[in-house]
Amino acid sequence: MIDYEKIKKAVIMIIEAIGEDPNREGLKETPDRIARMYEEIFSGIRETPEKHLSKVFKVNNDDVVVEKDIQFYSMCEHHFLPFFGKVHIAYIPNGKVVGLSKLARTTEVFSKRPQLQERLTSQIADSLMEYLKCKGAMVIIEAEHLCMSMRGVKKWGSKTTTIVTRGEFQKDNSLKQDVLNILRL
């Protein structure tokens, strides 16, 4: 559970620090709105992927499973500005698969917290290896970072791509290339 009062006090201090009046009509309810928003967008802090990856289904083959274009958003831990984009997940089952929605939910567990894209990519892949005991995992994230668009270098529309491979995807370049071809990356 988050500390609403502490967040509200901090937001009031920020409003005052930038030279605004926290009692101005448009800002009166802002501290409460931000506290409620933070509970939602940082809900992954209180979750683990285990609850999403523990329900599995037996399969008789170990063909690659690819779930692409999972939309996500997260908050850059350096500037507390959003980054957002698409996650593509591939894994090689080891006799069991997980429901496809569980891959999106696992993405949310890790994206709904202050985050780095590089860490997010690794956490998703590592959780698949740990909980599914799959033969290999590959996660690709393409994201736009508002800390690159709104401030500093101000390069709107630039995207960052991170790729993490585990297991068989690290050992067999043709498997990795097959997934990239499916995704057309």
UniProtKB/Swiss-Prot annotation:
One of its GO terms (cellular component) is cytoplasm. InterPro entries: GTP-CH-I_C/QueF, GTP-CH-I_N, GTP_CycHdrlase_I, GTP_CycHdrlase_I_CS, GTP_CycHdrlase_I_dom. It holds the Pfam family GTP_cyclohydroI. Zn(2+) binds at C76, H79, C147. SUPFAM superfamilies: Tetrahydrobiopterin biosynthesis enzymes-like. The gene is folE. The keyword Nucleotide-binding applies. GO terms for biological process: one-carbon metabolic process; tetrahydrobiopterin biosynthetic process; tetrahydrofolate biosynthetic process. This is GTP cyclohydrolase 1. Toroid-shaped homodecamer, composed of two pentamers of five dimers. Keywords: GTP-binding, Hydrolase, Metal-binding, Nucleotide-binding, One-carbon metabolism, Zinc. Pathway: Cofactor biosynthesis; 7,8-dihydroneopterin triphosphate biosynthesis; 7,8-dihydroneopterin triphosphate from GTP: step 1/1. Its EC number is 3.5.4.16. It catalyses: GTP + H2O = 7,8-dihydroneopterin 3'-triphosphate + formate + H(+). It is an enzyme of class 3 (hydrolase). Belongs to the GTP cyclohydrolase I family. One of its GO terms (molecular function) is zinc ion binding. It comes from Clostridium novyi (strain NT). NCBIfam families: folE, PRK09347.1-2, PRK09347.1-3.
